[in-house]
């Protein structure tokens, strides 16, 4: 956003889904913005910057609550750009349309990552943009290839964002397996849910609303004494991850924008407690049983571990 000349701002998350909270987005638009009748869009009261786009992140394999966000987009005249990098194949039931919609198909545009660790991963760096806007598609094609409209003719300053043929070939083959792999991830998640049943006070499990079909890019639990649990799992030979250890608005890259601790309390609290357990389609029942047993054993030793 900032590299494109805009000013980023952040909306807090829903405590259960970890995706953008539409109610907080509305609060931002109604409380921190005024209507700019000349531009026909909301503008920040203090900075004067217009709200031209909102980027909901489909996190951990689950889509954001798109209907509510799109309703606000229609009301306040901004574009919705989906960050679908972790949600290849995820679905959302749109009450507005009375049908299931895929991640990347609802906004004005969407970004996908094919980093090797994603549900659909290349063998190196790769990504894609989807849109129904032909003019935007042409702009993306131009920018990705050093701004060339044809070879050696540069219309604008662009960059090298080309997807090479080898990566595209791998992705084309793997795409045919994506639905099966996503279904296997759902089965792995369901087994975890059953293994941790009864321990929800110590291990808060991923929440999947009825309007969501997650593809479980990550299986993220929430615990109290995370560092100690992670250490004990590591000692048991079980790898874990933290996605993510710091809220983006508090990173050094954005310190010049004046964001402070407490601006996004839900996201900040989650960052201190979330822990990603092993998740991939081939994870076996016996492996999951061992992981769950080690987690529960560690939490029995650790007091005050509730989320």
Where are each of the predicted segments found?
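Substrate-binding/gating loop at the entrance of the active-site cleft, primarily
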Residues: 1-23, 117
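Conserved G/P- and acidic residue-centered "switch" motifs that form tight phosphate/ATP-binding loops
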Residues: 5, 83, 133
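Short, glycine/acidic-enriched loop or turn micro-motifs at the edges of active sites
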Residues: 15, 61, 85-86, 281
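PLP-dependent aminotransferase class I/II
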Residues: 23, 35-49, 53-56, 62, ...
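Short, Asp-centered acidic motifs that coordinate Mg2+ and/or phosphate
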Residues: 52-53, 79, 109
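Conserved active-site segment immediately N-terminal to the catalytic lysine
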Residues: 82-121, 150-155
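Adenylate-forming
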Residues: 111, 122-126, 169-171
């Amino acid at each position: 956003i900032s590299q494109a000349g805009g000013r980023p701002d952040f909306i807090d998350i829903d405590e259960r889904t970890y995706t953008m909270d539409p109610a907080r987005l509305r609060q931002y638009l109604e409380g921190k913005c005024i209507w700019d009748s000349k531009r026909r869009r909301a503008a920040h009261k203090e900075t004067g910057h217009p709200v031209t786009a909102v980027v909901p992140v489909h996190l951990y394999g689950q889509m954001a609550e798109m209907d509510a966000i799109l309703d606000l987009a229609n009301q306040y005249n901004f574009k919705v750009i989906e960050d679908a990098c972790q949600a290849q194949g995820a679905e959302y039931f749109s009450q507005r349309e009375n049908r299931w919609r895929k991640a990347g198909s609802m906004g004005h545009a969407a970004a996908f990552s094919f980093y090797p660790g994603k549900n659909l991963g290349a063998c190196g760096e790769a990504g894609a943009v989807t849109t129904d806007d032909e003019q935007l598609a042409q702009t993306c094609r131009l920018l990705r290839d050093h701004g060339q409209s044809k070879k050696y003719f540069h219309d604008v300053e662009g960059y090298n964002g080309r997807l090479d043929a080898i990566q595209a070939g791998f992705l084309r083959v793997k795409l045919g397996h994506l639905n099966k792999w996503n279904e296997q991830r759902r089965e792995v998640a369901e087994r975890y849910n059953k293994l941790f049943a009864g321990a929800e006070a110590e291990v808060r499990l991923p929440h999947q609303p009825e309007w969501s079909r997650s593809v479980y890019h990550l299986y993220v639990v929430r615990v109290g004494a995370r560092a100690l649990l992670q250490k004990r799992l590591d000692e048991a030979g079980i790898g874990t991850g933290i996605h993510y250890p710091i809220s983006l608005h508090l990173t050094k890259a954005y310190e010049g924008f004046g964001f402070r601790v407490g601006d996004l309390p839900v996201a900040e609290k989650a960052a201190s407690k979330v822990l990603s357990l092993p998740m991939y389609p081939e994870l076996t029942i016996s492996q999951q049983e061992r992981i769950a047993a080690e987690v529960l054993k560690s939490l029995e030793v650790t007091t005050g571990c509730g989320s």
